[in-house]
Regions:
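Short, glycine/charged-rich "phosphate-handling" switch motifs in NTP-dependent
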Residues: 100
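C-terminal output helix
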Residues: 107-116
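Short hydrophobic/Thr-rich beta-strand motif most characteristic of the beta2 strand and flanking loop
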Residues: 26-33, 41
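Active-site beta3 strand of CheY-like receiver
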Residues: 45-51
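Active-site residues of response regulator receiver
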Residues: 53, 83
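Receiver (REC) domain active-site loop signature in two-component systems and cognate sites
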Residues: 56
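Charged docking surfaces used in two-component/phosphorelay signaling
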Residues: 16-24
Length: 122
């Protein structure tokens, strides 16, 4: 049975690129446009990993991760943050919220797949 990954990003084109790479690697994918959309799509669904942008309208990625970690069923689900910002303060904030990995945009799909496989496969 394939593992399911949720991609949360306000850029439809980025979601598409990530989705194609993940599906090509054998993962099932759910997409959401922001944190609010993501929380709604998680209702009654089990995902094994979440990839979330940091800067999004409505609910940013760090707020989304904080809300996600309040949900018992997702407390230990790994999260990879995507961002154009690579500052240490943002990284610390994301890690404090519960993110396990940080990928700076632009990135190559292979780079993302290494991080995904590392967090999903153990």
């Amino acid at each position: 049975m394939a593992k399911t990954i949720l991609i949360v990003d306000d850029s439809a084109s980025l979601r598409q690129v990530v989705s194609i790479a993940l599906k090509g690697a054998g993962y099932d994918v759910i997409e959401a446009a922001d944190g609010v959309d993501a929380l709604a799509k998680l209702n009654g669904v089990k995902v094994h990993l979440i990839i979330s942008d940091v800067n999004m309208p409505t609910m940013d990625g760090i707020t989304f991760v904080k809300e996600l970690k309040k949900l018992t069923s997702y407390k230990f689900t790994p999260v990879i943050m995507l961002t154009t910002e690579c500052g240490d303060d943002k990284k610390r904030e994301g890690q404090a919220a519960g993110a396990k990995a940080w990928i700076v945009k632009p990135f190559k799909p292979d780079q993302m797949l290494v991080a995904v496989n590392k967090l999903v496969m153990p």
